[in-house]
Amino acid sequence: MIEFDNLTYLHGKPQGTGLLKANPEDFVVVEDLGFEPDGEGEHILVRILKNGCNTRFVADALAKFLKIHAREVSFAGQKDKHAVTEQWLCARVPGKEMPDLSAFQLEGCQVLEYARHKRKLRLGALKGNAFTLVLREVSNRDDVEQRLIDICVKGVPNYFGAQRFGIGGSNLQGALRWAQTNTPVRDRNKRSFWLSAARSALFNQIVAERLKKADVNQVVDGDALQLAGRGSWFVATTEELAELQRRVNDKVLMITAALPGSGEWGTQREALAFEQAAVAEETELQTLLVREKVEAARRAMLLYPQQLSWNWWDDVTVEIRFWLPAGSFATSVVRELINTTGDYAHIAE
């Protein structure tokens, strides 16, 4: 299995280094749910600004403040502890009056707004995230500048970031150990993390192999294509290749790669043979996913950061802003720009 740092680059390995997350303020994330609170219902949506706190810790503290069980507080996604982040939490408080959440006190945390809502906020139920990153001690400004220009046109590989695999790859290692036994994993969190790491690693491997081709965005017979921003896909046929290629070039369609699991992967013929060959040696992880009935799915091979802009504060410091859809990783954008240094270079966003 290819280590994250050794995955194929779309724009070639960066020539320079830089410091990511010299302090939390250098990594700002604003969650975009894509909808507004209903204004009524048994749930309360709470928008929180946090610095130096992980999401679960804040959720547990909010539950304690509201005198409800921790499981009654949900969120759409985990946000990094070592960053400044805005995100929504959701507390179920049926039959209770609206509490005064301005009285909620937690170091590094501030309630920005709150309102009633009809539905529970579930994991993954967000549109995306807006990022503002500051890269410091950049050793090669010209290289980073050109890469930013190229990313605007060609995007970046839509890799799952290193944080998906746990500290030191612990989640992937757990999946491999599990794959080698028939012992049930009772811990739901471990089970979820390990299966997710297994499938993500296989996806990354398929994309890395595809990126070795001379023309990464060349549609081949049997490719599974999806409309940009949509989840469903269809299979490319030989007769349609020219027209489909035009639509891929226009970024109307996206070539996808497999998230392997049980059931059909979605590609056919030449494209399916390529994907199967790319992960042919990873039989243990594939068997685990089938055994645990994790359904196969698709994910876009490339990622195009939206609203990408940047501002050089000086020759060694650049502020970069962009928006990514849910499930995408800012660190997968940064790895195409610089070789990152710093203790938190790969921490989750």
Swiss-Prot record:
Record keywords: Isomerase, tRNA processing
Cellular compartments per GO CC: cytosol
Catalysed reactions, as listed in the record: uridine(13) in tRNA = pseudouridine(13) in tRNA
TRUD domain sequence ranges: 155-303
Matches recorded under SUPFAM superfamilies: Pseudouridine synthase
Keyword Amino-acid biosynthesis among record annotations: no
PROSITE patterns documented for this protein: TRUD, UPF0024
Recorded superkingdom: Bacteria
Stretches that traverse the bilayer: none
Record EC number: 5.4.99.27
Enzyme active site: D80
Gene Ontology biological-process annotations: tRNA pseudouridine synthesis
UniProt binding sites for substrate: F27, N129, F329
Single GO term (MF): RNA binding
Cleavable signal peptide: none
HAMAP family referenced in this protein's UniProt entry, alphabetically: TruD (MF_01082)
NCBIfam families: PRK00984.1-4, tRNA_TruD_broad
Similarity comment text for this entry: Belongs to the pseudouridine synthase TruD family.
Function: Responsible for synthesis of pseudouridine from uracil-13 in transfer RNAs.
Name of this protein: tRNA pseudouridine synthase D
